[in-house]
A protein has these predicted regions:
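Active-site neighborhoods and metal-handling regions in enzymes and metal-associated proteins
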Residues: 2-268
Length: 268
């Protein structure tokens, strides 16, 4: 899984590298798809959910813009503009093992500090959750840490952040979506134990308004009901006997976990 995670880490960097005003979300998709293919991996998003005549999800990434939270479909006609908030979610399979990761970025300069703070709060919540993950902990500890971080950021920033429920993280390994579901709200000491060998995708989604969502007519794109902008952050992690390792971060999560005093377990 670490090998798949490193491929995806490089792909996400490539996708971020082409984000600019005047670029289509399909161009971001294609940049990520090229890195995945060059590594001998395949996308686990493309044709996800296919059944019979239904081809499933039509792209390598989810490209969600502004009020789109998750599962946005890339398009050659969806042209990014300065100030847009783009969430890139992608995954790959290498040698039968899956990886899944997401990042939110602004196109050019952010239109306001509240949007800068939104992305920072979402990323911090992800890292707070990951920092609690270790052998003999419980899933509720991780979920509570995400929720608590969002609430703390809201107080610190003087803003309302909506923590999206109903969408969240998941187990990952020989399939992209496996048990358990990883909610972004929870209670400490509750839920299944985190045991060595377990792999999870940790992915908070927060909004600048209320957390209520709706799905668009394409059957995929999830947006905020109130039209507020949203951010999404995600890494795939592994629980080991000695702690946690971030599979989809080139540094195994060292930079993100440092502020929590956590040193990730190297798997390279």
């Amino acid at each position: 899984m670490r090998a798949a995670g490193l491929v995806l880490a490089r792909a996400i960097v490539a996708g971020r590298g082409v984000v600019a005003a005047g670029v289509s979300t399909m161009e971001v998709n294609d940049a990520i798809a090229a890195v995945i293919a060059d590594a001998g991996a395949t996308s686990n998003f493309l044709h996800y959910g296919a059944r019979g005549a239904d081809p499933g999800f039509p792209a390598t990434i989810c490209a969600s813009v502004n009020s789109e939270i998750v599962h946005g479909i890339p398009s050659a006609t969806r042209i990014l503009a300065t100030g847009d908030l783009l969430s890139i979610d992608a995954g790959c399979i290498l040698d039968g093992w899956h990886a899944d990761s997401a990042v939110s970025v602004h196109v050019g300069e952010a239109p306001s500090m509240e949007e800068v703070d939104l992305i920072a709060a979402c990323e911090l919540a992800m890292w707070a959750g990951i920092a609690t993950a270790g052998p003999d902990g419980r899933l509720g500890d991780l979920s509570w840490a995400i929720q608590n971080s969002v609430e703390q950021s809201a107080r610190q920033d003087g803003r309302r952040y909506g923590s999206v429920a109903g969408y969240g993280g998941h187990g990952i390994g020989t399939a992209m979506h496996m048990a358990p579901f990883v909610p972004n709200q929870g209670k400490r000491g509750k839920g299944p134990r985190l045991i060595p060998g377990m792999a999870l995708a940790v992915e908070p989604m927060i909004t600048l308004g209320r957390p209520a969502t709706r799905e668009l007519g394409d059957g995929w794109t999830v947006v905020t009901k109130d039209g507020s902008r949203a951010a999404h952050a995600e890494h795939s992690i592994a629980i080991t006997e000695d702690g946690v390792s971030v599979l989809t971060a080139a540094d195994a999560g060292a930079a993100g976990l440092a502020r929590f005093g956590v040193v990730p377990v190297p798997l390279d």
